Amino acid sequence: MSPSTELLIQAQGLNTYYGASHILRDLSFTVARGETIGLMGRNGIGKSTLLKSIMGLVKPRSGQVNITGRAMTGRSPYEVSRLGIAYVPEGRGIFGNLSVRENLQMAARAGTRGQRDWTYERVLETFPRLTERLHHGGQQLSGGEQQMLTIGRALMTNPDVLILDEATEGLAPLIAREIWRICGLIRESGISSVIVDKNWKHVTQISNRNVILVKGQVAFEGGSEQLRANPALLDQYLGV
């Protein structure tokens, strides 16, 4: 699906600190409806901090976060998620004492897409591995299955934007390929997404636009072909 000009997320001039450490430096970032963004950069340069600033998990010292045109700076993660933003954090955060079925069903939220809604049945069709584990507790799943469950649970909210922080970190290659396949399906469904991952080759196969951060600022913004055609830039900013 081609992105539109409607901005679902608009962050302007963010300055976010951890104590005395200045992490985001006057950073601006947008997500349009239908857009898939690859958010990249070396470790510790502000990618997760940007996502947490958008989600209300960290409060910027200055700057503005608008979600679907509403001022949401400093609002709670719950309030942000109610506006259609789903967040899959690094570390997943599933409910280990609940079954796979319970993890999914507790997140269910009616959508507005009709037959294209992410229902319980559609999520299980997308993640057939979870069908085999419905009655297993979250803590009994492998790392890859937990990641599938976390993404499936996020889709059950029928979001407008899905944010994936370290989408395939620590996963076996076979499972990682399955996650990338699912990311492609999410793009085709029309949901906007922001994908953080170290595998720039896979990210750029899916993304419409790519943003590279360096020291809390945007160092590059452009299309996948532009990024892949510039090995010097990849080496400078990503070390590849």
Regions found by a protein language model. Give the residues of each.
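Catalytic Walker B motif of ABC-type/P-loop ATPase nucleotide-binding domains
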Residues: 162-166
